[in-house]
Amino acid sequence: MTGQRTQHVHFLGIGGSGLSPLAQIHLAGGGTVSGSDSEDSPRVATLRARGVPIRIGATPGPAAFAAELAGADVVVASSALPDDHPEIVAARALGLPVRRRSEWLPELTAGYRLVAVAGSHGKSTTSAMLTLVLRAAGLDPTAVIGAEVSQLGGNALAGSGDVFVLESDEYGGAFAGLDPSIAVITNVEWEHPDVFPDEASVRTAFAAFARRVRPGGRLVVCGDHPGVVAVLTELGRQRPGNDVAVNDVAVIDYGFGAERHWRAVDVVTTAGDDMTRATVLRAGQEIGALTLTVPGRHSVLNALAVLATATELGVAPAQTLTTLTTFTGAARRFEFVGFWNGPADSTGVGPAGGPGSLEVIDDYAHHPTEVRLTLAAARSRARGRQIWTVLQPHTFSRFAALLDDFAAAFSDADRVYVTDIYAARETDDLGLHAVDLVKRVSEPAATYYVSWPELVERLATDVRVTLSDEASRGILLLTLGAGTITTVGPRLLAALGFSAAG
């Protein structure tokens, strides 16, 4: 293990959310890191600031590429790169072993008590919450998270303790080779239709992941979720609970249901401070009050997963509850962008806006369930304001497979804008368009297609017109998607005359 950690690893796609934290962890552990990427980014800048040589752009000639890889022991390639990518082919021609991220993770996490946090939704927030709790408890964990977390200084944390928190993705079988001491499954739904042909194949993948838990380990699951229940059934367990082990692994469930081992009741959002509050029960006994700055019932479920997991790692529930109160969220998870207080205002007012104002929130939601939960969280704190949603669909395959589910996801919105599909790794060979979604949405009636180039100008015009009405109680505007939609909020505020978040 020590030899592996001092290796020289060259990362292809080093600036991506999947590989950049692995590079940081390897570097912090005493290893040597180099890499390449197709484009510059803040993640690349962070690694360069730590002395990592990174080439940006097209693959160089054979001699230059060989010099670039001089001294490397292994090449780790992003899952986004095909096997015939020139740099993968060239690395193999040089005799270097090439590993995919999923193949490298078991080596990186060897020797740790691995906590693998999986699920179709909620992985990043749950991983971030758990890492913050374990750090506050003195366990000094190592962590790899799929989102930037300001309280942790980024998307990776290199600790000196024996616990490794890993956000574990099902895409491309990324979690298939892990051997966790604790596996967390937040929920299971059909996602990534480009690799999973149906919901059954997703459940099978999660069941295989659950079987990887080490003997004597723990499987922490949301017992309320039908997809999780189906996975447990596939594992041979007839229902969620805490009385039977699966393959010598204790199953610990959480949720809102009366039978859950960890349960939240009396969930409310208080109007005065927008805090989410609940009472937490363990085995039917009240253990304390949960207070979160992050909104929504789904955030309460994430917190329950953290409570269950941290307790198994020796952290007192009371201490976990105290730390969770301080959690401020992960990037692009109901993230505040800024306020604009109407046509007469060009300065903004910082952390709070009154009637007639615009508040912009950005969220990574790109699946119908995520859209629905984010809108429900927004409704809980809207206080009479209109909720406007701006969706950039992400990938043609997801859009096609889940089109009807998307159409039913907007009932908590007052107005919906759908812009052009973000292709990501795909090409448009399905003949679908964002207009196909607009035609299917029946609620709300105010649903529009706006092309990407025209989006910010159209939003700015509509916001000005709406907020010019003295009767307007204001707008809570959500930008949703996993692509470039995150740029829309700042650009909209700039177009309105204010660009600084409070």
UniProtKB/Swiss-Prot annotation:
ATP binds at residues 119-125. It catalyses: UDP-N-acetyl-alpha-D-muramate + L-alanine + ATP = UDP-N-acetyl-alpha-D-muramoyl-L-alanine + ADP + phosphate + H(+). GO terms for cellular component: cytoplasm. SUPFAM superfamilies: MurCD N-terminal domain (SSF51984), MurD-like peptide ligases, catalytic domain (SSF53623), MurD-like peptide ligases, peptide-binding domain (SSF53244). Transmembrane segments: none annotated. Its EC number is 6.3.2.8. Belongs to the MurCDEF family. PANTHER family: UDP-N-ACETYLMURAMATE--L-ALANINE LIGASE, UDP-N-ACETYLMURAMATE--L-ALANINE LIGASE-RELATED. This is UDP-N-acetylmuramate--L-alanine ligase.
